[in-house]
């Protein structure tokens, strides 16, 4: 255990920076962030006990410092004025001239693009391109519509069709699938007393006739003969017109007259009581 602790102390002491080294970052961004006051590269200095151990950086950084010193220097106030500008703000006295030009409606573009030569030496801010929009343009694009009527949403004038009477009106009211027997019963205007005519007579089993009304003694459409779909032994109960319908032959539509009376007695005796 003592040997492990001793080896750890030796490794920690050997890794200490006891020899002067040249510490340089991959780019000069860190040095620029630390030295924005005078705008030039300065050697990186530690704050603490390592200042007495590491001497000032010689050699390469001093050459870079000598090269940078020949360039024009910018103070911190100039950099702050650059950073504080917004796109819709115009510096110095150019804002007053632009406001007057916007009110007149015809701003002088030549004066905006080419500032006077006296201001170039006074301040470098005169090269900022102004983006202030004149008032006549702001009034044009000041409001935007919230809802726009599309071409297919515009109100259209509906022309009312002339009133039809008789057979033509009845044909317009009946849909195209009425001839197949799927439409609900509708009242014919030609039937007196407001009687309703079913599209398909399920009890009788006859196809509906083509409706036709006499016009001056002639038929508009020729009448078709009713087609009977009823079979002889269809097994359908047909109600009679008598007040007390008979329920003897409920499951059979009729009695075969060829059956002998003896066979009829046998079949009646086989029925359940």
UniProtKB/Swiss-Prot annotation:
Transmembrane segments: none annotated. Highly expressed in tooth-associated epithelia. Predominantly expressed in mandible. O-glycosylated. It is found in: Secreted; Cytoplasm; Nucleus. Keywords: Biomineralization, Cytoplasm, Glycoprotein, Nucleus, Secreted, Signal. Residues 240-252 have a biased composition (Polar residues). Residues 125-127 are annotated as: Interaction with ARHGEF5. Residues 110-121 have a biased composition (Low complexity). InterPro entries: Odam. Interacts (via C-terminus) with ARHGEF5. Tooth-associated epithelia protein that probably plays a role in odontogenesis, the complex process that results in the initiation and generation of the tooth. May be incorporated in the enamel matrix at the end of mineralization process. Involved in the induction of RHOA activity via interaction with ARHGEF and expression of downstream factors such as ROCK. Plays a role in attachment of the junctional epithelium to the tooth surface. This is Odontogenic ameloblast-associated protein. It comes from Mus musculus (Mouse). The gene is Odam.
């Amino acid at each position: 255990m003592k040997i492990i602790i001793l080896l750890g102390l030796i490794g920690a002491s050997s890794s200490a920076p006891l020899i002067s080294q040249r510490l340089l970052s991959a780019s000069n961004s860190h040095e620029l962030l630390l030295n924005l006051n005078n705008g030039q590269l300065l050697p990186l200095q530690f704050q603490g006990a390592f200042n007495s151990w590491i001497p000032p950086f010689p050699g390469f950084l001093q050459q870079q410092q000598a090269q940078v010193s020949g360039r024009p220097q910018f103070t911190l106030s100039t950099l702050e004025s650059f950073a504080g500008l917004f796109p819709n703000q115009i510096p110095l006295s150019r804002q007053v001239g632009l406001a007057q030009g916007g009110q007149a409606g015809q701003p002088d573009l030549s004066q905006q693009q080419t500032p006077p030569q006296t201001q170039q030496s006074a301040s470098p801010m005169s090269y900022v391109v102004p983006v202030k929009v004149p008032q006549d343009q702001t009034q044009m694009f000041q409001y935007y519509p919230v809802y726009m009527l599309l071409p297919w949403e515009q109100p259209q004038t509906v022309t009312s069709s002339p009133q039809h009477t008789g057979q033509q009106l009845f044909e317009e009211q009946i849909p195209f699938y009425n001839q197949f027997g799927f439409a609900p019963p509708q009242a014919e205007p030609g039937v007196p007393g407001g009687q309703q005519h079913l599209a398909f007579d399920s009890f009788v089993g006859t196809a509906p006739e083509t409706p036709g009304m006499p016009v001056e003694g002639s038929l508009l459409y020729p009448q078709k003969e009713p087609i009977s779909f009823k079979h002889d032994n269809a097994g359908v109960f047909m109600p009679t017109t008598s007040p007390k319908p008979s329920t003897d032959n409920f499951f059979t539509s009729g009695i075969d007259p060829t059956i002998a009376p003896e066979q009829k007695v046998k079949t009646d005796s086989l029925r359940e009581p």
